[in-house]
Amino acid sequence: MRRRKWELAEYWLGMSTKENISTLEIPEGISVSMVDRTISVQGKLGTIKKDFTKLPAILVIENNIVKIQPYGKRRRDFAISKTARSIITNMIKGVQNGYKYKMKIVFAHFPITVKVKDGKVYVENFFGERKARISKIVGDSTKVTVEGDDVVISGPHLEDVSQTAANIELSTRVKNKDQRVFLDGIYVYSRE
């Protein structure tokens, strides 16, 4: 049976220099664990899991430090390890503080109404359309609330929150018209 590269971690760590290892310290009150190259981060706002099976690097968690070492020594390999490090950093920040996107409902003539039901956002009366435009809420821990002319999206997972905001914005895109004139829609105006 052929072995996978991450099963030979000791061999790879012994071969390369220590310069190309990117490290990340885990703050207090947060626990990071890894099972089958799936990293889970736990904190006061919940847990986040991310699968790193296709990452061409070695992941090691020791003494509250996450070590990421790429297999190669090229610039692209270092960029991949830095990207994985920033993803884990975003997971830690999300579990500590959470992320919040604020979107503004903009309309000129037909008043847009936004409702949240069953993990979906319904945009009604967009340009007087009788059928509601539907966009999906990504992730179980992502919450969407409507406060007047604002739509607030919050949650611990940055990718889920930003993808939900993108889904809402894309569902209200105006097609076959000049977008400088027809400005109706829902747009992101604040990221926290």
Predicted features, each with a name:
Residues R2-E192:
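Ribosome-associated RNA-binding proteins
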